[in-house]
Amino acid sequence: MSELTKAQQQNFTKLQKKIRRNTGKAIADYNMIEDGDRIMVCLSGGKDSFTMLDILIGLKKSAPISFDLIAVNLDQKQPGFPTHILPEYLDTLGVEYRVVEEDTYSIVQDKLIEGKTTCSLCSRLRRGILYRTAKELGATKIALGHHRDDILETMFLNMFYGGKLKGMPPKLVSDNGEHVVIRPLAYCREKDIIKYADLADYPIIPCNLCGSQPNMQRQNIKQMLNTWDTQFPGRIESMFTAMQNVVPSHLADFNTFDFKSINRDSGVINGGDIGFDKEEMPVQPVDIDDAVTEFDPSLKLDIVNVQ
């Protein structure tokens, strides 16, 4: 880390506590990490994965359980990829790591159409390699650096372009059914991670080395959410809270809720015909410190749910 002013150091410490608190809360809520786990931390060289590794290292030191971390980077043989940066950085941390070399760049370039994105193909290839690597390393969990904004963006992408009310789960079983994938930063805001990574002075590696165009649908969603965040303070917090407070009886998916069996003897279900009552809506705080996590200080080091 470069030399910080006193004000910058105070801001860094505040951000670190916030991100660590939110990460610990997410880990506890979804039982992401258990005693004896070997966590494969996927390190791309971007701000999110650097922050995730940093926070997990800190939690490991103070956690009431024992777990191991191994950082894994996939060198996809993109022209100009600085192969020395991550090994040098990880050596300074003293963390176990592995760099996996696979030329997925050439495969993707063969499919690349000018002006189009091949991110989905690249992602599928990358996932397959990471799943294989996790098995080779004996990892029990695979940690990805997606944050709360990614989760909300994915939900709106599915709503607007896929016709599904579906987001990005904080914890899931991998596509091949062999691994548990976790997203420890699920409660963290991207804007906090950006500020934290800037102050931490991570050796960020550009994500556009492949030459592919950005996913414009996701970029449009991101811009929409950023606009809402500015114009309507608290809206982002409220939307994420909604993802944790689903009422299937008041949606329209008959595969999720048994509408067919409802009759007069069923009784009032989840408020009956009250679709929305503004009077009953809790006021959503603007600051993430008071939003979503509502952190209990007694849980600050308990990164697993022991009950």
UniProtKB/Swiss-Prot annotation:
Please tell me which top-level EC class this enzyme sits in: transferase
Taken from the UniProt entry, a GO cellular component term is: cytoplasm
Q: What S-S linkages are listed for this chain? A: none
Signal peptide stretch: none
Coiled-coil ranges per UniProt: none
Recite the UniProt keywords alphabetically.
4Fe-4S, ATP-binding, Cytoplasm, Iron, Iron-sulfur, Magnesium, Metal-binding, Nucleotide-binding, RNA-binding, Transferase, tRNA processing, tRNA-binding
Q: Which reaction does it catalyse?
A: cytidine(32) in tRNA + S-sulfanyl-L-cysteinyl-[cysteine desulfurase] + AH2 + ATP = 2-thiocytidine(32) in tRNA + L-cysteinyl-[cysteine desulfurase] + A + AMP + diphosphate + H(+)
Q: Where in the cell is it found?
A: Cytoplasm
The cofactor note from the UniProt entry for this protein is: Binds 1 [4Fe-4S] cluster per subunit. The cluster is chelated by three Cys residues, the fourth Fe has a free coordination site that may bind a sulfur atom transferred from the persulfide of IscS.
Q: Out of the domains of life, which is the source?
A: Bacteria
The UniProt entry's sequence similarity note says:
Belongs to the TtcA family.
As for what it does, the entry says: Catalyzes the ATP-dependent 2-thiolation of cytidine in position 32 of tRNA, to form 2-thiocytidine (s(2)C32). The sulfur atoms are provided by the cysteine/cysteine desulfurase (IscS) system.
Q: What additional remark is attached to this entry?
A: The thiolation reaction likely consists of two steps: a first activation step by ATP to form an adenylated intermediate of the target base of tRNA, and a second nucleophilic substitution step of the sulfur (S) atom supplied by the hydrosulfide attached to the Fe-S cluster.
Subunit and partners? Homodimer.
Q: Quote the protein name from its UniProt record.
A: tRNA-cytidine(32) 2-sulfurtransferase
Q: Which organism is it from?
A: Aliivibrio salmonicida (strain LFI1238)
Source species taxonomy: Bacteria, Pseudomonadati, Pseudomonadota, Gammaproteobacteria, Vibrionales
Q: Which gene encodes it?
A: ttcA
